Amino acid sequence: MVVADANSGRAVYWGTGRRKNAVARVRLVPGTGQLTVNGKDGNLYFQFNPNYLGVIKAPLETLGLENEYDILVKAEGGGLTGQADSVRLGVARALCQLDPDNRPPLKTEGYLTRDPRAKERKKYGLHKARKAPQYSKR
């Protein structure tokens, strides 16, 4: 969804991403490439981990737009890995709204695919989802 920012009048591009239990609502605003997550600097939020930051900026790097848009994120649920992957999906979806021609390169890189893997539920009679109690022959 494209909305004009009430204060500055700049276009704002929205995208929502989900992964495991994490949900990220992402806004792309024309700017200098800053990442803000839940009101904090993105580097601080993701503990200066280059893996998380690289995952998040990958869709922008694919299109060569690293320093052209600020990323504003509201992330909740899950852990840092799930949140980072959900932010990546949200950024990719927002970039598709920015320009429909962005879709094919993002699709080929797999950035528009929602990862369906989630934690498997625990079954009764087992210790965890699949871990059975130790077998005793006698």
Curated annotation (Swiss-Prot):
Sequence ranges of Basic and acidic residues compositional bias: 100-118
GO molecular function ontology, one term from the record: RNA binding
GO biological process: translation
Record keywords, A-Z: Ribonucleoprotein, Ribosomal protein
Basic residues bias spans: 119-138
SUPFAM superfamilies, per the entry: Ribosomal protein S5 domain 2-like
Protein name from the UniProt record: Small ribosomal subunit protein uS9
Organism of derivation: Nostoc punctiforme (strain ATCC 29133 / PCC 73102)
Lineage: Bacteria, Bacillati, Cyanobacteriota, Cyanophyceae, Nostocales
